[in-house]
A protein has these predicted regions:
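A small-residue-enriched
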Residues: 26-50, 89-162, 260-281, 292-377, ...
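Periplasmic alpha-helical coiled-coil/stalk elements that build and connect Gram-negative outer-membrane
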Residues: 167, 176, 183-300, 410, ...
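Acidic, low-complexity, intrinsically disordered peripheral segments
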Residues: 277, 290-292, 441, 462-497
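Transmembrane beta-barrel architecture of outer-membrane proteins
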Residues: 83-85, 150-152, 198, 243, ...
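Amphipathic alpha-helical coiled-coil scaffold segments and their short linker/junction regions
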Residues: 63-68, 72, 76, 91-93, ...
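Sec/SRP-type N-terminal targeting helices
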Residues: 98-99, 161-189, 239, 243, ...
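Post-signal-peptide N-terminal segment of Sec-exported extracytoplasmic proteins
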Residues: 45-89
C-alpha cells in the first residue's frame, strides 16, 4: 500500500514538473535586444582634421577629435565663469526640471510597488467576529432555531506563480518606462544648459551689434551736419542732405528692434534660470569673455545612438513595448495562483486558541483561457504598439544623425564665413586708413572719410555676428552629440549590455 502511494506521489510530482517545464517553454517572448546601430556613414563626417581659421577674435581653428571625453560639462569650455554660474542656477531652479524629477520619482515608486506585488507572496492577517442564527427547518428538521457566535483569526498567503513569464515581462516594462523618464530628465537638463548658453551668446552679440549700430547712427549724424553746412555755403545741393537723412532714419529704425531683441533675450534668460523677468539683475554677457573650444567631437553614428539621452529614451520605450507584447502573449497560457491559510475558529473568544480550533487550507488554482476573443486582440494590439515603438526609435535615431551632421557642417561653414568676413573687415580697415592719409594731405574730402568709416562699422557688425555664430555652433554641436551628462561616455542599458 505504501509503495503504491509512493509511486502515485512520484507520478504526480513528475506530472507537475512536466507541466511547469511546458509552461516555462511558453515564456512570453525572447529577451529584448538593443537594435543594431546604423552604418557609420563617413560622408557626414568632416573631411579635414580642423576647421578654417581667421585672423580675428574667436577665429582660431578648432580640432576634430573622435575620442573626446563628453561626460564633463561642455559649457565650461566656453570660458565664462558667469555662464557657468548661471547654468548651475538654472539646473537647480528650473520648474521644468523639477517637474521631470517628480515624474521620475513617481515612476520609480510605481515600479517598486508593482515589483513587490508580483515578485513576493502576499500575506494578510484576518480577524473576524460574527453572530448568526440557524433554522432547523432549512434542513427539513423540526425544532427551534439556534443562535451562536463565531470568532476567527487567520493568516492568508497568496502567490501568483509566474511560469509563463507574464509577471517578469510586466516588471521589465515598468523598469523600461522608469528608464525612459530618467533619460527624458537628462535630455531636459542638456537642453536647458544649451538654451542658456545660446541665449547668453545671443545677448553678447546684441551688445556688440548695438554698439556698432549706435556708431553708424553717430557717423551719419556727422555726415548730415556737414552736408547741411555745405548747402548753406552753396557747395552742395539739398538732395545730398535728404539722401543722408534717409540713411540716418533707416539706421535709427534698427535701434527699437535692437532694444526689443535685447529685452527678449534678458527675459528668456531669466525664465530659463527659474526667475521672473525683471525681478533680479542678470549677468551682462560680452563676446570678449567667451572662449572658442579648441577641440570638438567628431562622432560616428554607431557611437551617437549610445550617447544621446533622447535616443536612449526611445530605446527604453521600445523595450517597454516589447515587454508589453510579452505580457499579452503570457495571458494566452495557463495562469497558476497558490494560496494558503492558517488560523483558528471557535464559538467563543476563550476557546479560540484551544487545541480543537485550528483550521487551515491550501489552494492551487490553474486558469486556462478557452474562449476569450479579447486576449488574441490584445496580443495583436501589443504587437502593433511594438511596431510603432520600433518605427519611432528609427525616426529618433535618424533625426539625431541629421542634427549632428547639420551641426558639423555649420561649424565648418561658419568658420569659413568668419574667415571671409575677417578679410572684408581688414580690407575696410585698410581703406579707412588710406582715406585718413588722403584726407590729411587734402586729396580726400571729409565726406569721403565718413563714408569709409561707415563701411568699417557695417563690416564690423557682420563680423561680430559671425564670431557669435561660431560660439553658438560649438554649443549646438555639443548638445547634438549628447555631451554633458555622466551617461555620455557609456550608457548602461536595461538588458545588461
Amino acid at each position: 500500500m505504501t509503495g503504491t502511494f509512493t509511486r502515485q506521489r512520484a507520478t504526480g510530482l513528475r506530472a507537475s514538473w512536466l507541466l511547469a517545464a511546458l509552461l516555462a517553454g511558453c515564456a512570453a517572448g525572447p529577451d529584448f535586444r538593443r537594435p543594431l546601430p546604423p552604418a557609420d556613414a563617413q560622408g557626414t563626417l568632416p573631411a579635414t582634421v580642423q576647421t578654417a581659421s581667421a585672423a580675428t577674435a574667436l577665429g582660431q581653428a578648432q580640432q576634430w577629435n573622435e575620442r573626446m571625453d563628453l561626460g564633463a560639462p561642455w559649457w565650461r569650455q566656453l570660458g565664462s565663469p558667469q555662464l557657468d554660474a548661471l547654468i548651475d542656477e538654472a539646473l537647480a531652479a528650473s520648474p521644468t526640471l523639477a517637474s521631470a524629477q517628480a515624474t521620475l520619482r513617481q515612476a520609480q515608486e510605481l515600479q517598486g510597488a508593482q515589483a513587490a506585488t508580483l515578485q513576493w507572496p502576499r500575506a494578510d492577517l484576518v480577524l473576524g467576529s460574527q453572530r448568526q442564527r440557524t433554522s432547523p427547518s432549512a434542513q427539513g428538521q423540526a425544532g427551534p432555531g439556534r443562535e451562536f457566535s463565531l470568532q476567527s483569526a487567520s493568516i492568508g498567503v497568496q502567490y501568483p506563480l509566474d511560469l509563463a513569464g507574464g509577471n517578469r515581462r510586466a516588471l521589465e516594462a515598468l523598469a523600461a518606462r522608469t528608464e525612459h523618464r530618467r533619460y527624458q530628465l537628462e535630455a531636459a537638463r542638456l537642453g536647458l544648459a544649451a538654451s542658456v548658453a545660446s541665449v547668453a551668446i545671443t545677448q553678447a552679440r546684441l551688445v556688440a551689434q548695438g554698439e556698432a549700430l549706435q556708431a553708424i547712427v553717430d557717423n551719419l549724424q556727422q555726415q548730415g551736419a556737414l552736408a547741411r553746412e555745405r548747402v548753406r555755403l552753396g557747395q552742395a545741393s539739398p538732395d545730398e542732405v535728404l539722401a543722408l537723412q534717409a540713411l540716418l532714419e533707416q539706421a535709427r529704425s534698427g535701434l527699437p528692434q535692437w532694444h526689443k531683441q535685447q529685452q527678449q533675450a534678458a527675459h528668456l534668460l531669466a525664465t530659463l534660470a527659474g526667475r521672473a523677468p525683471g525681478t533680479a539683475a542678470l549677468p551682462a554677457f560680452t563676446l570678449s569673455e567667451f572662449r572658442l573650444p579648441e577641440v570638438l567631437p567628431r562622432t560616428i553614428p554607431s557611437e551617437l545612438v549610445r550617447r544621446r539621452p533622447d535616443v536612449q529614451a526611445a530605446q527604453a520605450l521600445l523595450q517597454a513595448a516589447s515587454a508589453d507584447h510579452g505580457v499579452a502573449v503570457a495571458r494566452l497560457y495557463p495562469q497558476i495562483r497558490l494560496s494558503a491559510s492558517l488560523g483558528r475558529q471557535a464559538l467563543s473568544t476563550g476557546a479560540l486558541f484551544g487545541g480543537e480550533s485550528a483550521v487551515w487550507g491550501l489552494v492551487a488554482q490553474l486558469t486556462q483561457p478557452l474562449f476569450n476573443p479579447a486576449l488574441p486582440a490584445e496580443r495583436r494590439a501589443a504587437l502593433a504598439a511594438l511596431n510603432a515603438a520600433a518605427a519611432n526609435y528609427q525616426a529618433v535615431v535618424l533625426d539625431a544623425l541629421r542634427g549632428v551632421a547639420d551641426a558639423m557642417r555649420a561649424v565648418e561653414g561658419d568658420a569659413q564665413a568668419l574667415a571671409a568676413l575677417a578679410r572684408s573687415d581688414a580690407a575696410a580697415q585698410a581703406s579707412l586708413q588710406s582715406m585718413e592719409r588722403q584726407h590729411a594731405l587734402g586729396s580726400a574730402s571729409y565726406v569721403q572719410l565718413l563714408v569709409a568709416q561707415q563701411q568699417v562699422l557695417q563690416a564690423r557688425s557682420s563680423l561680430v555676428a559671425a564670431q557669435a555664430q561660431r560660439l553658438t555652433d560649438s554649443a549646438l554641436l555639443f548638445q547634438a552629440v549628447g555631451a554633458g551628462w555622466e551617461g555620455a561616455a557609456s550608457v548602461a542599458t536595461l538588458d545588461g549590455r
